[in-house]
């Protein structure tokens, strides 16, 4: 392993994530918060829910009750006056349903003088859920979508119609109370109705689109689910104010600044990366190989969210697969590629992403690993573990997509 490049990668990752932590972003958004004279209730959902709620309660001084639902391992302690729950992601589980039921109960019977502060971040589609079909069927449909390679917009177009809280329905449940929503964006282009499936945003998708997606991926659906896909969701809400704060653009900008401080000349390739993870990795590896040997230190940055088509039975995530796919092109070069999820998790693993450099391919071959066979089996985690290329940050408390970087030192 190239220890200098790995050290640089770790510094860039740390600086990038620190720049998009929700604390300051929430406090900035609260400058525009004007609650009515009645009760102020807080509901937070998503991977960043605990940190967002903690920052909000500290800034406001008090709330009259609240519910937080976040991913397992993401609750960092008690928040005064708030009930905190952990639940399943990327597939909702019984705790997702139970916590969301608590949130719905909290907002029942509110008046026009009451205010709901709704804090939303990525992951909310799984964590904040009250299904309109049996829970087991919703889990099966979610697994089908995850395995199909459907992108996040396609997935959420389906999930909205199978939920009592998505697609604007949570805001309807809060009415006539005012809803002030603060959103951390984890979807490219920041489409508010798609972030966590838009519980407090009028739905911009149509039932025709939902049915087309179901047909495209040949989803196995019950008659009840098919009927729900054919029904429209709320298209207008008059009790909601929404403020977006934090996005992949800020993540990429922070990565570029960190690269600059380490002596690299950074170039942002895109902040809308959306393709197969291994294709993105191969591309970044090819870029690094093309520019290797130059005197100037270079950094190529890509932000977004790739997808993985599951064909094997291995363990990994999109960032780990992206990194491993870059390893063959980097062989023998003074270059590295790393990719990390800003939330600190990547797939069903304890890793946030993966790192490879010019030594990785040879190190894996010496241990009997074939990169291409490993990618076919979707087993990037164990290969990177063998090459000491796992990136483990722990839960970060934020979630604004992923960032991948190719570093070239000459």
PLM feature spans:
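Accessory alpha-helical/coil subdomains and C-terminal extensions
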Residues: 177-180, 202-283, 287
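A glycine- and small-aliphatic-rich helix-loop capping segment at beta-alpha/alpha-beta transitions
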Residues: 55-65, 79-84, 104-108, 131-144, ...
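Active-site segments that bind and position negatively charged phosphate/pyrophosphate groups
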Residues: 263-339, 347-348
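Internal helix-turn-beta structural module
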Residues: 324-410
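Internal gly/pro-rich beta-alpha loop/helix module
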Residues: 134-220
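Short beta-strand segments
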Residues: 43-45, 67-70, 117-122, 181-187, ...
């Amino acid at each position: 392993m190239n220890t200098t490049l790995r050290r640089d990668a770790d510094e860039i990752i740390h600086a990038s994530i620190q720049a998009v932590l929700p604390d300051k972003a929430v406090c900035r958004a609260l400058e525009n918060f004007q609650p009515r004279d009645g009760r102020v209730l807080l509901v937070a959902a998503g991977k960043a829910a605990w940190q967002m709620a903690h920052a909000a309660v500290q800034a406001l001084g008090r709330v009259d009750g609240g519910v937080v639902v976040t991913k397992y391992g993401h609750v960092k302690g008690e928040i005064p006056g708030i009930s905190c729950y952990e639940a399943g992601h990327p597939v909702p589980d019984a705790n997702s349903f139970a916590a969301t039921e608590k949130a719905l109960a909290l907002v029942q019977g509110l008046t026009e003088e009451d205010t709901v502060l709704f804090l939303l971040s990525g992951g909310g589609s799984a964590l904040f859920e009250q299904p309109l079909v049996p829970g087991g069927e919703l889990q099966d449909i979610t697994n089908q979508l995850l395995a199909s390679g459907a992108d996040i917009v396609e997935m959420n177009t389906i999930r909205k119609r199978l939920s009592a809280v998505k697609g604007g329905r949570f805001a309807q449940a809060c009415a006539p109370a005012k809803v002030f929503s603060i959103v951390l964006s984890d979807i490219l282009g920041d489409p508010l109705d798609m972030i966590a499936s838009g519980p407090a945003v009028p739905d911009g998708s149509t039932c025709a689109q939902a049915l087309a997606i179901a047909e495209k991926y040949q989803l196995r659906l019950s008659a009840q689910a098919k009927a729900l896909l054919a029904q429209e969701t709320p298209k207008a809400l008059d009790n909601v104010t929404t403020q977006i704060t934090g996005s992949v653009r800020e993540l990429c900008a922070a990565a570029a600044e960190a690269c600059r401080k380490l002596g690299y000349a950074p170039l942002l390739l895109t902040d809308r990366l959306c393709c197969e993870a291994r294709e993105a990795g191969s591309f970044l590896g090819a870029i690094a190989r093309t520019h290797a040997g130059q005197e100037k230190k270079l950094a190529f940055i890509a932000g977004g969210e790739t997808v993985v088509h599951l064909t094997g039975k291995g363990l990994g995530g999109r960032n780990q697969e992206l990194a491993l796919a870059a390893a063959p092109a980097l062989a023998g070069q003074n270059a590295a590629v790393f990719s990390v999820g800003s939330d600190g998790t990547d797939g069903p693993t304890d890793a946030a992403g993966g790192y490879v450099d010019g030594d990785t391919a040879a190190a894996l071959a010496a241990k009997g690993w074939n990169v291409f066979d490993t990618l076919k089996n979707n087993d990037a985690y164990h290969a990177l573990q063998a090459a000491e290329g796992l990136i483990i940050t722990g839960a970060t408390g934020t979630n604004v997509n992923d960032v991948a970087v190719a570093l070239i030192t000459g």
